[in-house]
Amino acid sequence: MAVAYIQEFPITNRSTENYDFVAEKIGDGPFDGLIAHTAGFDDEAGVFRILDIWESQEHAQRFLDEHVQPLVDQGPAAFPNPDNFTQPTRDGFYELHHAVSGAGAHAISS
């Protein structure tokens, strides 16, 4: 079942330095089960939001455990902007009823 994974971080400044550091370390994939990845500022909500769509929660959790968590576990000192290293205020999954991806218009419905 397709799921969305969302993280939101309060906007303290408009720096993406730590996000860019993680993205560079992880690379561009391909990652098993990833359908789409987005990241950007939602000024109205006051957050920097990461939103991924995965084929399943298991795919997402495997990716997080293998690629993201080892970097986060190193702590703020490992990041280029340690003063801007914060925990997300929102971090979780939700089941998707329907999703459509890019050029091939690949639809996923529950």
Go through each PLM region and give its residues.
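Short S/T/G/P-rich N-terminal loop/turn motif that feeds into the first structured element of a domain
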Residues: M1-D73, A77-S110
